[in-house]
């Protein structure tokens, strides 16, 4: 594929900006972050107006309630973004840190210095708040970012990137460090995937189709943020009331997010007690239950189809299965899980430890809601996504995960024998 001159020019400008940003002082970067936060507040009405254009077009196009929820900018979203920017500004700057310094027998001091990755291509769907979060993290880590957002959020993203570029300039940093690809045409995704000489990493964040397209086409390393087909296993030894509260929070607190609960696996010995309690709580919350044959025999639920076990709903729908043992639960998760978030409710220590060891996911929890798979909740500050790839980063990607290390050696005239 031939890259369009316009997109290539944007990538070249990002490359030049990345070189400048890699040597920027922590003070300059933090000044820019705080300026972005101030502009989010000062330009709130203009941002709401741009977002209304996107919401009206999305509603006319028949977008789902879950997608509309992710698209919406309101006072709480902007307040959370401002808080996140302030927290990122307060975090230690990892760039230039030297880790693992050791003195070799010949007196040579060897360590690893943390450095920016360079230029990040961020391909994502209808979440304008991700525009700010991703840009802030890349800025703090000394990276330039080339954003390709979804067409649903075009007006919102343009407004957000415009104010962030103004903040960069005010801080004496290149405005090209944060750029929005000037088209929502799908061909731009393929073009970005082929910019191996200009982009250092691509992070796709969205549905299965987008992730698979980028992984198939990219000539650049990819850190995938895939869908969250997240399970809760309710072990026979658990407190059923506690398990119901965890399931309820996981499903209903914000069902449109990738760390929400989609499936519940219930040990057969506790199912007769737990499932009626679960059904009552979910019915009150407006959640549609689907289940296997054993579940449907115990509570009112729609019979689950084979597709249900491999579907991320991002909606008030929950699929339930009764299993015979911990082993069966582990096998089910290995088959249908998406390596995102998995949880167990149990009072059995050995079962908890086995679940932690054997489940392959970016976050595995014991007696806690899957909604905790989030950069802020895990102490990272904001996140650019939750990596379900194992190389370089696994789990929420904060500032440190957007850097790499190079070896450095400090000598006093040593030569090799």
Curated annotation (Swiss-Prot):
Catalyzes the NADPH-dependent reduction of L-glutamate 5-phosphate into L-glutamate 5-semialdehyde and phosphate. The product spontaneously undergoes cyclization to form 1-pyrroline-5-carboxylate. Coiled coil: none annotated. Its main location: cytoplasm. NCBIfam families: PRK00197.1 (NF001221), proA (TIGR00407). The keyword NADP applies. InterPro entries: Ald_DH/histidinol_DH (IPR016161), Ald_DH_C (IPR016163), Ald_DH_N (IPR016162), Aldehyde_DH_dom (IPR015590), G-glutamylP_reductase_CS (IPR020593), Glu-5-SA_DH (IPR012134), GPR_dom (IPR000965). Keywords: Amino-acid biosynthesis, Cytoplasm, NADP, Oxidoreductase, Proline biosynthesis. The gene is proA. It is found in: Cytoplasm. It comes from Meiothermus ruber. GO terms for cellular component: cytoplasm. Pathway: Amino-acid biosynthesis; L-proline biosynthesis; L-glutamate 5-semialdehyde from L-glutamate: step 2/2. PROSITE patterns: PROA. It catalyses: L-glutamate 5-semialdehyde + phosphate + NADP(+) = L-glutamyl 5-phosphate + NADPH + H(+). SUPFAM superfamilies: ALDH-like (SSF53720). Its EC number is 1.2.1.41. This is Gamma-glutamyl phosphate reductase. Belongs to the gamma-glutamyl phosphate reductase family. It comes from the Bacteria. GO terms for biological process: L-proline biosynthetic process. HAMAP family: ProA. One of its GO terms (molecular function) is glutamate-5-semialdehyde dehydrogenase activity.
């Amino acid at each position: 594929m031939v890259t369009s001159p316009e997109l290539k020019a944007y990538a070249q400008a990002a490359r030049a900006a990345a070189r400048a940003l890699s040597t920027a002082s922590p003070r300059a970067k933090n000044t820019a972050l705080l300026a972005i936060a101030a502009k989010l507040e000062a330009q709130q009405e203009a941002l709401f107006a741009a977002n209304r254009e996107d919401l009206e077009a999305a509603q006319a196009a028949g977008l789902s309630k879950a997608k509309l929820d992710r698209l919406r900018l309101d006072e709480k979203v902007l307040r959370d973004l401002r808080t996140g920017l302030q927290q990122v500004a307060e975090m230690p700057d990892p760039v230039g840190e030297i880790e693992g310094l050791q003195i070799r027998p010949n007196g040579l001091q060897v360590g690893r210095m943390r450095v920016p990755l360079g230029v990040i291509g961020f391909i994502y769907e209808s979440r304008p708040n991700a525009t700010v979060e991703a840009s802030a993290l890349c800025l703090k880590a000394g990276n330039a970012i080339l954003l390709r957002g979804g067409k649903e959020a075009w007006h919102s993203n343009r407004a957000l990137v415009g104010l962030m570029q103004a903040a960069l300039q005010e801080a004496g940093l290149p405005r090209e460090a944060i750029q929005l690809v000037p088209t929502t045409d799908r061909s731009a995704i393929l073009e970005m995937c082929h910019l191996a000489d200009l982009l250092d990493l691509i992070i796709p964040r969205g549905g299965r189709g987008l992730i698979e397209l980028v992984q198939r086409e990219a000539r650049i390393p990819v850190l995938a943020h895939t869908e969250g087909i997240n399970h809760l296993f309710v072990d026979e030894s658990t407190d059923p009331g506690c398990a119901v509260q965890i399931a309820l929070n996981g499903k209903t607190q914000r069902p449109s997010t990738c760390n929400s609960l989609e499936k519940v696996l219930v040990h057969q010995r506790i199912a007769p007690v737990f499932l009626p309690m679960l059904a009552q709580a979910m019915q009150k919350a407006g959640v549609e239950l689907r289940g296997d044959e054993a579940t449907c025999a115990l509570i009112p639920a729609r019979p689950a189809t084979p597709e249900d076990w491999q579907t991320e709903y991002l909606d008030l729908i929950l699929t339930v299965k009764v299993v015979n043992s911990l082993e069966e639960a582990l096998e089910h998760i290995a088959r249908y899980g998406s390596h995102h978030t998995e949880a167990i409710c149990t009072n059995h220590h050995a079962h908890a430890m086995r679940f932690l060891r054997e489940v392959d996911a970016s976050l595995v929890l014991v007696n806690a809601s899957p909604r905790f798979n989030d950069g802020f909740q895990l102490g990272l500050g904001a996140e650019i996504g939750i990596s379900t790839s194992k190389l370089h980063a696994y789990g929420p990607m904060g500032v440190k995960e957007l850097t790499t290390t190079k070896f450095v050696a400090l000598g006093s005239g040593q030569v090799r024998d």
